[in-house]
């Protein structure tokens, strides 16, 4: 068979066709392939947008308007790209949540590359948000890059180096466009490494136990199952793009960037609001930045905080309760991130931030130990 002998086809065959897969993985395992779909979608639409976009402060805003008004189906490509980012992060957060729930983080290499992918995706999305050069683009870039000035000693110099001047200006926009274009390809390369390490161990499953004795080939079982997920997610996506394209955006970004006029509420896109809320909950600049970075980096500690003798949460009611508390807490933080900095939102944000770290670092490891005791293992 050619797919088993041809050097290139052999790699594809081992990854997507004859790959031994657990027979019982649920719909939560669909999000890996959906993330691949999102990445392809973003690179394709982004490429066509880059053909018409100009990364100059004087013309960037107008070039985006030109894409929407004058380019054939430019409005569709632009809104697919903008909402594609939201879809990407929805799939990303569900994918990470699945990994936490079923103990997939015990595949350390795969998990750590996943965290690196999350950081790179967040950086790419942030820089992409700056490109239309609207009010929120400009002020978002100013606020977020300014956070680096909290780094002791080198901070202020580092910020000016990133800006390419003394404020967010033409140099900043040009380099953000260059980086926004190149990063997705670096992400694609890392995705292949992510898959390489995953296929070394094989997939986890909802029971969290080895499934070597009953594995099935990926094709046709999971190609079909993934395709169903693709159809469902595309229906949701296209409904949003065609009926509610601006629902997730900020109206301020329809005003061209003006360094002399600050918007009343500077807020990032919805998918960063939870981290923004954690950042704002600490009334000290360096402390806030450390909390912000820790909120993502804490994921890297999960393999070392795993105390239970079972891998998955499927049969651990205490840890399940804590997991869903964590999900609720993140939704609460997302809401707080979009609210102004005034009572009662300040204290709610601070309590939710404390709760976030407490659940992950303290309560879940303790719950694992209690469950071990309950089972008398």
UniProtKB/Swiss-Prot annotation:
Cofactor comment text: Binds 2 heme b groups non-covalently.
Annotated residues for binding of a ubiquinone: 199
Topological type in the membrane: Multi-pass membrane protein
Transmembrane segments annotated in the record for this chain: 31-51, 75-96, 111-131, 176-196, 224-244, 286-306, 318-338, 345-365
One example of a Gene Ontology biological process annotation: mitochondrial electron transport, ubiquinol to cytochrome c
Gene that encodes the chain: MT-CYB
Cofactor needs: heme b
Keywords: Electron transport, Heme, Iron, Membrane, Metal-binding, Mitochondrion, Mitochondrion inner membrane, Respiratory chain, Transmembrane, Transmembrane helix, Transport, Ubiquinone
Binding-site residues, heme b b562: 81, 180
Locations listed in the record: Mitochondrion inner membrane
Binding site for heme b b566: 95, 194
Description of how the protein assembles with itself and partners: The cytochrome bc1 complex contains 11 subunits: 3 respiratory subunits (MT-CYB, CYC1 and UQCRFS1), 2 core proteins (UQCRC1 and UQCRC2) and 6 low-molecular weight proteins (UQCRH/QCR6, UQCRB/QCR7, UQCRQ/QCR8, UQCR10/QCR9, UQCR11/QCR10 and a cleavage product of UQCRFS1). This cytochrome bc1 complex then forms a dimer.
Remarks, miscellaneous: Heme 1 (or BL or b562) is low-potential and absorbs at about 562 nm, and heme 2 (or BH or b566) is high-potential and absorbs at about 566 nm.
Protein name (Swiss-Prot/TrEMBL): Cytochrome b
GO cellular component: mitochondrial inner membrane; respiratory chain complex III
Record family assignment: Belongs to the cytochrome b family.
Function: Component of the ubiquinol-cytochrome c reductase complex (complex III or cytochrome b-c1 complex) that is part of the mitochondrial respiratory chain. The b-c1 complex mediates electron transfer from ubiquinol to cytochrome c. Contributes to the generation of a proton gradient across the mitochondrial membrane that is then used for ATP synthesis.
GO molecular function, one term: metal ion binding
Organism of provenance: Heterogeomys heterodus (Variable pocket gopher)
């Amino acid at each position: 068979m050619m797919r088993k002998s041809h050097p290139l086809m052999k790699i594809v065959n081992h990854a997507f066709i004859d790959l031994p897969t657990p027979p019982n993985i649920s719909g939560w395992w669909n999000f890996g392939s959906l993330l691949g779909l999102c990445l392809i979608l973003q690179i394709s639409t982004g490429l066509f947008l880059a053909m018409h976009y100009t990364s100059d402060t004087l013309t960037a805003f107008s070039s985006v308007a030109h894409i929407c008004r004058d380019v054939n189906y430019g409005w569709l490509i632009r809104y697919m790209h903008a909402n594609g980012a939201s879809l990407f992060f929805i799939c990303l957060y569900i994918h990470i949540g699945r990994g936490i729930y079923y103990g997939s983080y015990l595949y350390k290499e795969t998990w750590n590359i996943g965290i690196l992918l999350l950081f790179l995706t967040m950086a790419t999305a942030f820089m992409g948000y700056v490109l239309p050069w609207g009010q929120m683009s400009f002020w978002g870039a100013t606020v977020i890059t300014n956070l680096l000035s909290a780094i002791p000693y080198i901070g202020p110099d580092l910020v000016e180096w990133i800006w390419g001047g003394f404020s967010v200006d033409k140099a900043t926009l040009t380099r953000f466009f260059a980086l926004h274009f190149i990063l997705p390809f670096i992400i694609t390369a890392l995705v292949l490494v992510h898959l390489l390490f995953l296929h070394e161990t094989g997939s986890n499953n909802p029971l969290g136990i080895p499934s070597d004795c009953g594995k099935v080939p990926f094709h046709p079982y999971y190609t079909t199952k993934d395709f169903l997920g693709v159809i469902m997610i595309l229906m949701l996506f296209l409904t949003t793009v065609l009926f509610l394209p601006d629902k997730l955006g900020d109206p301020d970004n329809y005003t061209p960037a003006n360094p002399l006029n600050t918007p009343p509420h500077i807020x990032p896109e919805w998918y960063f609001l939870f981290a923004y809320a954690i950042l704002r909950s600490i009334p000290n600049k360096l402390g806030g930045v450390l909390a912000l970075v820790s909120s993502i980096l804490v994921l890297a500690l999960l393999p070392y905080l795993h105390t239970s003798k079972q891998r998955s949460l499927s049969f651990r009611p205490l840890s399940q309760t804590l997991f869903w508390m964590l999900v609720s807490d993140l939704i609460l933080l997302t809401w707080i991130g979009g609210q102004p900095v005034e009572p009662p939102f300040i204290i709610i944000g601070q309590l939710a931030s404390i709760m976030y770290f407490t659940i992950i670092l303290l309560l879940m490891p303790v719950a694992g130990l209690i469950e071990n005791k309950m089972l008398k293992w």
